[in-house]
Amino acid sequence: MLYNRCKDSKICLLFNNHLDEEAISRMDIRYSCNQRDFKRYTTEETRNEMLITGLYKADEMVAVYSHVDRMVTLGCMPVHEEVSIDKGIDVWANFGTHYFLERREIGIFNIGDGAGTVTADGKEYHLNYKDCLYLTKGNQKVTFKSDDPEHPAKFYMVSAPAHCSYENKLITIEQAAKRPLGSVETCNKRTINQFIHPSVLKTCQLSMGMTALEPGSNWNTMPS
């Protein structure tokens, strides 16, 4: 059941029908857990709760919603079709909004072998490998396509709630802020590429980056 405030802000209506049950079930929903219960998880239970797999399916939008910070992780690999951001997602049932980014912002990375294009409200953004696109709250129609179906783009995305709007921005790997860390001796020499970061652009609350390990290095952060 969902509550929705009417435009005049005087009446609150309750809706519990006309929901796309298939679309709701297609989005994986993860719940938070307390530390006492987590101590008793088996390896399989830990993987089921904490690990995201199967993000990329041809011409599909795969989404995982977490009740921790209300974050949504998405994966899209368009091959033969142009894929909408809300494909397979009942936005009204899951978020109580009329379109995906009505009250959300999103960061988009292309981690695929080929280049791709993201179209937001009619404006196209071309993403090569390791490029990033920030879309602010309020973009109504967002679609994804690959330049070459033989070498499709793979869009990795994270969306967070947003209460204010800024500007959409394409950030290339060259434009990202660089932060070198680690050393060869400890096998963790790496560069933190800060794409969606206050030093690069303004966002509501989302930050995203990409870590690049140097040859011979094999870990990022040592588990505590």
Which ranges hold each PLM region?
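Histidine-centered metal-chelating micro-motifs
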Residues: 115, 132-133, 137-145
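Short acidic-glycine-tyrosine-enriched beta hairpin
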Residues: 121-137
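Non-cleavable N-terminal signal-anchor transmembrane helices
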Residues: 6, 11-71
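Surface-exposed beta-loop interaction hotspot
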Residues: 144-203, 208-210
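Short, conserved beta-strand element in jelly-roll/cupin
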Residues: 101-116, 210-215, 224
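A short glycine-rich, His/Asp/Glu-containing loop-to-beta-strand
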Residues: 55-94, 187-224
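Long, mid-chain structured domain cores
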Residues: 109-112, 116-126, 143
